[in-house]
Amino acid sequence: MAQDDPFGTTRALTGRNTHLEPLASEVISVLCERQTTAPSGARQVVVDYLLRAVATRSSFDPTLVMEELRGYRLTIDAIIDLYIPEVATRMGEMWKTSDMDFASVTVGALRLQSLLSEASSNLARVNLSGVNAPFALVVVAEGEQHFLGASVVAAQLRRLGCDVSLSIAEAPKQITNRVLYDQPDMILMSCAQVSGLETVVRNVKKIRSVVDPSPVIALGGAMRGDLDGIRKKTGVDLVTKSAKDVVGFYMKRHKALSRG
């Protein structure tokens, strides 16, 4: 049997819920958008913010952008490893679809580079047990244009306890002279396209012919397909996008040589 509600709460709540439903739906929608992640694992709301920040026509302050990114509770590692590469990839895709012109992409890449420098200044380095800080040379050969990716790798290597030097668009002879002078423990060559593999082959052969023992040589970049076949063709020790893999390979070889 139905009972009277002397306080009229049923009617009041029903009316109030009717007014609140659109607001609640909007809040839920916004929260869902904030939780949306890209295939890389990056949160969409952060990617959208950073893309706007580097693409805006107004001035860009990497310090202020870093503060904003930290407001999203991001670690320095996540900013370097995930968000800067993700936004760089998005800009490349937008250029291919004519949603962003070349000049804007260039400016955006330079801004990401300055943000990377700002983030790298706050990096904490790890100490590799049992060895002095390994020295790594990151090489972007002539004809390659993806300097930002190499800078990200350099930052990751520094975080892993390495001393790092960058070789940007140097001729093969300059690279060889640098290797002879610096004696790096590992060399990371960046290659974005198959047409650049021949340059990698020449550089690897030259380095191995003049340095004994040869440093660990790794190949990274936008490599797809038969990675083991690429490794054999180029003569590198490993093909990987992970700086951690290269350092791990070096450490294993270093320990094996020390025992021998």
Predicted regions, residues:
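Short glycine-enriched loops at secondary-structure junctions
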Residues: 85, 141-144, 223-224
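Long amphipathic alpha-helical segments
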Residues: 1-124
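Conserved mid-sequence domains
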Residues: 121-208, 216
